[in-house]
Amino acid sequence: MDWTVREILNWTRGYFQGGGIGQPRLEAEILLAHSLNVDRLHLYLSPDKSLTQEERERFRAAIQRRHAGVPLQHLIGEVGFFGLRFRVGAGALVPRPETEELVERALALAPRERKIRCLDLGTGAGVIAVSLAKFLPNASVTAVDLSAEALELARENARSNGVSDRITFQESDWLRTVEGRYDLVVSNPPYVPEEEIDRLPVEVRDHEPRLAINGGKGGMERIEALTRDLGAHLHSGAAVLLEIGEGQGEAVAALFRQAGLTEVRVETDLSGRQRFVIGRCL
């Protein structure tokens, strides 16, 4: 049987709906366009095009993996973030829209009139570090992660976005081997409580690196480790911004104050949830 673009998209939408995928039509279009190596507009312009057997088999393999919980971004190998393109894979957390809000806040607080040093703790695929380097031409950035696999992915993303000359990548357990002081520190640390991980959606629980999501007991252990020696790495006037989990705002704000930060505040994301803690060094 020949399958046209229209027919296979309609069938896949139903298949994805049955699997509990939230945007079944959109994801079907994205995966089909990726499998055919065309953009989504091409699908609308050629709805009656028949797929070859090779194209059908390639698409079938992709939708079966998506139905089984493999993240869409892993299947297509990239994601858009803050207007840039990033390669993603199993070695690093898939960036979320909330982290774009974190970067937006960081850019708003960054000095522009002089050269500055920025620190991204737990860089993962490098989306924060690369975005800071791309939109702060006066900045040099240090990107830290404990995972060598994540750092390699981040290096590749720095190269593809043309900022590898201004980012230093460092393998470290938070600040343990980091030296010097910084003007801007940004982090999206693991903040999911360890006791809740088994209840996460399968695409997160089974396909995202545990190192990037497991925040330990209560989701606070990694954040506590991150903030413990923070004050020794800040220039006067430095801004610190962390992404946090729901219900963690006041506890993280208290850790900021213990680290000597002032002007500490908790801010909400676009959905109204407490998502960011921000402070400054005297």
Kindly label every feature range from the protein language model.
Residues 191-222:
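Mobile active-site "lid"/loop adjacent to the S-adenosyl-L-methionine
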Residues 31, 69, 99, 128, ...:
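Residue-level signal for inorganic ion chemistry
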Residues 1-38, 42-44, 51:
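Non-catalytic accessory regions of SAM-dependent methyltransferases
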Residues 16, 110, 158, 230, ...:
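Conserved hydrophobic residues forming the short capping helix/wall of the S-adenosyl-L-methionine
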Residues 30-108:
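Conserved AdoMet
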Residues 217-280:
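Conserved Class I SAM-dependent methyltransferase catalytic core
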Residues 97-199, 225:
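Conserved SAM/SAH cofactor-binding pocket of Class I
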Residues 163, 208, 234-236:
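Helix-to-beta-strand junctions that scaffold the AdoMet/dcAdoMet cofactor pocket
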